[in-house]
Amino acid sequence: MQVKIITVCGSLRFKKEIMEISENMELNGNCILPPIYPTRIDKDAYTEDEVFMLNKMHKEKIKLSDAILVVNVNGYIGNSTNSEIEFAKSLNKEILYYTDFIK
């Protein structure tokens, strides 16, 4: 069986759902690259350079992936996630949506 590498994209407000679906996808034989969750309570504690690096590394994950999984709870897709979708499309990556798995 060919292992599919999938980067998870979505709003961090859906952390619980992202963690659950990431686990389920790995249990089904996929290699999952989840987003990094901020550890600093105050988002302003991150410098511009740190925010830039986190975003850059997430895009590197997308480059390495066969597909991205968009965790779009209740159909919500924010601006950052939308830009990740467009980036993945520009690389001809497969786009999977969380809402397609829960029907």
Residue ranges and their predicted role:
Residues 1-103:
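Conserved catalytic or regulatory cores that recognize and/or transform ribose-phosphate-containing ligands
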